[in-house]
């Protein structure tokens, strides 16, 4: 277990320190079927929609698939921009994990595109990456969690 309190770790750790290299991007004109195929092939729950200058113009996530795409009358030939979310919140790689967690909680999102000083996409931070980081930081605590949050055992062995 780390010597510093978790609050300090989250404030001191910068996003670039835990960032994974995977970044899925597409143009707004990408056909809906192509976007869904990309998400399936890459086993990811998001695509950053960026213009030809790599600036974020939207996000297309599993949530958009569930809320907008799984409706009658949707054409798989429509451009993904018709279904993407346009109120996208971004951060930079130098922002803290605490800032990312705060933004995810405040806006109800699980993926945050990262932009550089030119406002171009340079990465993505997902809640999964944050959880993996915390699990690696606190392995004993994570591995000893009960299967259900409300489950309490009298002994360490679970009996």
Residue locations for each model-derived region?
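Tandem CBS (Cystathionine beta-synthase) repeat/Bateman regulatory domains
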Residues: 1-159
